[in-house]
Amino acid sequence: PVCVDGFTVKASDIDVNLHVNNTRYVEWAYNTFPLDYHKDYLLKVVEINFLAEGKEGNSLKVERYHLSECEDTVVIKRLDDQKELCKVNFEWQPVK
């Protein structure tokens, strides 16, 4: 991976069903890109696969893989069992 981050799920990340709110996964994935990246590339497509539920107190790892100039995949895993909770695919368009 070209970027790795880790943190613990907090109460503010949880929805009414006591699972991680789906929007949080997108935020966590998006935040693996530095602000300067967005000066050179515009987001074109986001595809999200929700694979398992995260809960408060889970320790998570976020890994970004650079697949090509305009394509990246971010995988969010639960640390205790390495279960993939979510995969987010980003397609970018260079700024002209």
Stretches with model-predicted labels:
Residues 1, 54-56, 65-96:
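HotDog/MaoC-like acyl-thioester-processing domains
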